[in-house]
Amino acid sequence: MDSYEYGELLKELSTKRDNIAKIIKPDSIENRLGEIEALEHSEGFWNDATKAGEVQKEKRKLERILKKYEEANQAINDAKELFEIATQDNDEETLGLLFEESGHLEKEIKSVEIEVMLSGEHDGSNAIITIHPGAGGTESQDWASILYRMYLRWAERRGFKVEVLDYQEGEEAGIKDASFIIKGENAYGYLKVENGIHRLVRISPFDANAKRHTSFTSVMVSPEVDDDIDIEIEEKDLRLDTYRASGAGGQHVNKTESAIRITHIPTGIVVQCQNDRSQHKNKATAFKMLKSRLYELELAKRSAEYDSMEKSEIGWGHQIRSYVLAPYQQVKDTRSNIAYSNIEAILDGDLDELLEGVLISQFDQPGE
């Protein structure tokens, strides 16, 4: 890196800093924190534990965003001042130190961008994930099971809990369907970018001729919504089916039809649960899953992205990422347009860099 490149980097990071300020409005955050402090000292505030908890959650989020912004802002201002002085004095030693620290400066801004992208209304929620293989039988079902393991490993790496709701094992290998909840801070915020079609290209382990095969699997992610969110679901729009739990995925096997499948006829959304021995509990969980999916659909309808998507894409999703194992190894995301060569690590749950790359690419898009 030379002085020209560093100067250009400072301009780029300053622009990003200014864009962040326009979005988060630091002065407004400080005003809101002042209002919260006054609330905390008001009579009877702590008597309503639920309301107090919501306010405290908002406070922590605002404090975290403001702190990260202020740290990044200060770091850029300090770097600018030091760079100007060092350039005027031709201080090679200081310039060298600034160049070495440039990566840290970029990370400061990246950290704020990610924090902003995780500040949506439901980003802090748990994530309900449903994985469904595309056409292709065993090949696609095996790919679905690889993705299932990838998300479970990601959750494990972050110390998040996983609750399996439904797991339908494939006849030869893989899975026909899987639904599960990942429970942890910002689980939905991170995983919301996984909505869509995931494409795999590899030499098939199921092909005696060792030919290259392409498989597709759909991943659907929705926030675990609170019970108090009002989503109208009419009984006439539902079809309920019962079936026996399959016993795969560490779940129990039983001889009664305790598993529940609910089809929402107007949208075609299907949810199913076999997590519990009780049909009543499975039905309650399935309704919660349906509620989350309908809420996610409503959010999509409100977004500008919805207007540009075909109806077929809404129902099935759109291709978001390719995983190529042969003839070369690469994972490429269509949103961030970033390619990664560490495909084995990614499939083993090392997803943070990839997820953050998508979040930041969305932050940089006009209108985000």
Curated annotation (Swiss-Prot):
Primary localization: cytoplasm
Q: After translation, how is this protein modified?
A: Methylated by PrmC. Methylation increases the termination efficiency of RF2.
For this record, the Gene Ontology CC terms, alphabetical, are: cytoplasm
- This protein's source sits in the domain of life called Bacteria
Give UniProt keywords alphabetically: Cytoplasm, Methylation, Protein biosynthesis
Q: Where in the cell is it found?
A: Cytoplasm
Member of which family?
Answer: Belongs to the prokaryotic/mitochondrial release factor family.
- What are the N5-methylglutamine sites (modified residues) in this protein? 251
Q: Which GO terms describe its molecular function?
A: translation release factor activity, codon specific
Claim: Cytoplasm is one of the keywords in the record: yes
Q: Which HAMAP family match?
A: Rel_fac_2
SMART domains, alphabetized: PCRF
For this entry, the protein name equals Peptide chain release factor 2
Q: What does this protein do?
A: Peptide chain release factor 2 directs the termination of translation in response to the peptide chain termination codons UGA and UAA.
